Each structure stands twice: as structure tokens, then as C-alpha cells.
Amino acid sequence: QSDWFGVDLAADGSRSFSHDWTPTSATADYFIDDNWSAHFLRPAHGGEQFDVEAIYFDNDASNAYMAIVTSFNTPGGVFYLGDVIHPGDLAMDLGGGSRDYGIDVDGATGLVADTDAGDWYQSNAIFLAENGPTNFSGGTSIGNASLDIYDAGIVEGGYGTYVIEVSVPRWMLNDPGAGDIIGLEWTMGCRNDVINLDGSFDG
């Protein structure tokens, strides 16, 4: 199955993916972090089920496109040591602060909100590998992005693989122009693994 960025996911069911992570779009920005650790001080703590594999960004004249590949069960969350760990929301930095926009992933609504630091919180306060915000509540609602979350149907390290895809109209992000930088961050409520990307708008 190919995601929006033309990446064909394939795995042999063991430790790592057996495919090329490179997107087909020449303008796409992406970062790959396909690894995990059983040790608390190395991401992804807790093993493969908390691994965030990759993040992508691209745009056209009308929309910004983002995709995340993870072994973390999204949007259902992971039951871990007596607690349900929830997916985080997608945080965006467009020059107004480290989290000046957010997209609701945990509730699977795709709600886009203009946020500030006080709107963000950590959704799971126990079993955390790192302190820091993961989800938002409040802010100023702008509209809804197109959000598609699906099970890619492949197994890596004994756990499924999930793809989170977002398409958001550029006007919802205050019409960024060519060369403008967008910072992206996604994690889960315990921050056992965190992935970041600085992308740029092309045209």
C-alpha cells in the first residue's frame, strides 16, 4: 500500500522495514527514525509498539500535506502497565511559537486550532520517558483538516503499522509563502518516542 508520498511500506515481520523510505515527490521534506530501544533513556522506550518510524511534509498551491508512520496504535492508543497511553496531536510551528498550531489526532477529528503554549499538556502523567506537551485543548478553532488514519496491514517487530495523513488548506495556516519554514512534532502521551521535522513551503 502506498501512502500520499509514494512510499510503499513492506516488512518481513521482524526488526525493520525492508523498503525505501524515499518519497516520490522531489519537493517533499522527510525524516526517518526507524529504531527502538528497551532501555528507558533511549527512544523509543517500551519497544516497537512505541516506535515512530517516519514523518513527511509537502505542499502544493492550495494545501499542506503531512504523513507520519508509526507502530503506535492510532487513534486507539496502547494499554501499558495498567494505563491507556493516548496518541498525541500534531504540533506545528510557523514562526509564532513552538506550538502555534495544532491538529487533533487523538480525537481523530482533524480540528485545526491556533494555539499557544498554555493550550498544550501531557496526556499521560505516568510511565513517561520525557516531560513535555503532547496534546492540546482550547485555542482558537479554525476549521478541519482532512485526516486519514489507517492500519497499513503490515507487521514490524510483532506490532502493526499505522499511517497518519493530513491535508490542511494553507489559508488555515495563515497562508505561508514560498520558503517559509514549518516545524512539525508528533509523539504519544508518554513521549516514549518523539519525531520532529522542519519542512519548507515550495511555491
Regions found by a protein language model. Name each.
Residues 1-9, 96-102, 159, 171-203:
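Acidic/polar low-complexity flexible segments
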Residues 3-22, 37-124:
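Surface-exposed, glycine/proline- and aromatic-rich loop segments on solvent-exposed faces
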Residues 27-50, 132-140:
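Short, solvent-exposed secondary-structure boundary motifs
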Residues 50-53, 166-171:
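Short alpha-helical segments and helix-capping/turn motifs at coil-helix boundaries
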Residues 61-63, 85-87, 159-163, 179-181:
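A general secondary-structure signal for short beta-strands and their flanking turns/coil
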Residues 109-161:
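Short helix-loop boundary/capping segments
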